[in-house]
Amino acid sequence: MAPHSSSADAGPPVWHGTTILTVRKGGKVVIGGDGQVSIGQTVIKANAKKVRKLGKGDVIGGFAGATADAFTLFERLEAKLEQYPGQLTRAAVELAKDWRTDRYLRRLEAMMIVADKDVSLVLTGTGDVLEPEAGVMAIGSGGNYALAAARALIDTDQDAETIVRKSLGIAADICVYTNGNLTLETLTA
């Protein structure tokens, strides 16, 4: 008899979901994300909001990963933004330091894209604070698809919002953990 695996063998269920994309073009920065949350092969929620304004509305962000973990990180980032007003990069680096060294924060499973009028950044639990080379960056299960689509469109005459919408649509067509229920936030750069 051939071996098989069951959900009992696999450990806790794996949560999947989301694609977050940022595009900076033409004096605007847009972060967009889809609304799907899945556990295993089941869609649990189709209209989750994973993109939001932070601080005083001068920073926007999106997350991929565990929702509670992401909101904890957003709260910590907002505290750092209060400590370092108008300095998103400094606030992000300080959060990344805490994320790597704090015993509680180290267990959080999420990634974030944040942006203000000057800079877009990806923050990871490994302490990375990365700025995109061409104003385009993506995270999450469909991130590579959205990133490829956005890179293909960045040099066209389409604006940042259109590129985000089209790229997330392409990701949703390819990635089973991404849907077409989009949330976008925009800042004038």
UniProtKB/Swiss-Prot annotation:
SUPFAM superfamilies attached to this UniProt entry: N-terminal nucleophile aminohydrolases (Ntn hydrolases)
Enzyme class (EC, first level): hydrolase
Alphabetical UniProt keywords: Allosteric enzyme, Cytoplasm, Hydrolase, Metal-binding, Protease, Sodium, Threonine protease
Compartments in which it is found: Cytoplasm
Active-site residue list: 18
UniProt-listed Enzyme Commission number(s): 3.4.25.2
GO molecular function: metal ion binding; threonine-type endopeptidase activity
Primary localization class, coarse: cytoplasm
One GO cellular component, as annotated: HslUV protease complex
UniProt record, GO biological process: proteolysis involved in protein catabolic process
Gene3D superfamilies reported for this sequence: Glutamine Phosphoribosylpyrophosphate, subunit 1, domain 1
Residues annotated as binding Na(+): 172, 175, 178
Pfam families per record: Proteasome (PF00227)
Activity modulation notes: Allosterically activated by HslU binding.
Reactions catalysed according to its record: ATP-dependent cleavage of peptide bonds with broad specificity
Similarity section: Belongs to the peptidase T1B family. HslV subfamily.
Quaternary structure and partners: A double ring-shaped homohexamer of HslV is capped on each side by a ring-shaped HslU homohexamer. The assembly of the HslU/HslV complex is dependent on binding of ATP.
NCBIfam families reported in the protein's UniProt record: ATP_dep_HslV, PRK05456.1
Annotated HAMAP family: HslV (MF_00248)
Role noted for this protein: Protease subunit of a proteasome-like degradation complex believed to be a general protein degrading machinery.
Name under which the protein is recorded: ATP-dependent protease subunit HslV
Organism: Rhodopseudomonas palustris (strain ATCC BAA-98 / CGA009)
